[in-house]
Amino acid sequence: MQKLFILSVATENTEEFKRFERSLNIQEIEYKILGMNTKWQGGNMEMGPGGGQKINMLRSELMTWNKERLNKYTILFTDSYDVITLTNFTEILTKYNNLCDNDTVLFSAEKNCWPLKQLDIFYPETDSEYKFLNSGGFIGNAEKILNLLEKKIDNSEDDQLYYTKIFLFDNKIDNSINKIKLDYKCDIFQTLNGAFDDIDIVNKKRIFNKYTNTFPCLLHGNGPREIKEYFNKLSESIIKYYSKF
């Protein structure tokens, strides 16, 4: 049986990171943080493209795993400072297995085409408003994720563009199986940029997407300052709810 293991990158032990880690501990999910107390060389991602260092850290970690471990684990890679986990590993794994086979990595989806708006014409048609790849969260077999990371990237280059190019232009295994699928209905990943009106809080601890009629498993406050402020307020209220028990 596959086991879920969360990997994330954080170089500083900030209050935002502690909130993310608290959410993982609440849900009792096994995890490892990459890069703590090392120098961040991935650019200022609040101001523009960057984040290639996350890919390099992830690749370096997975290359230390033996074949048996790579096959055994389903990896969920996520951002940390602007993310919280909302449910347990069983729900996450069940949803992933219902959406994908073991050859495919499921990426978070968002409403904005970033960082190159001009790539929107290459995206496949879908009924969902969440049609663009977001690299802040993805889940798949550890070996399949490592296979996605073959191409080199500089630390300061953009991680979202790296994965977007694979999805748009190099997404087939043996001309039949997709390497990457997008979480069009936010079954697992909920991005917030442009999605204020889509979500409600249910029972003070879960997010419900009214547009997709789903209960996402992770909440990601991607986007500009007003998004971060909304995410901070929302995530703090959810963490506070769990702190009562």
Language model segments and positions:
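Juxtamembrane luminal stem/stalk of type II transmembrane Golgi/ER carbohydrate-processing enzymes
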Residues: 1-8, 14-16, 91, 227-245
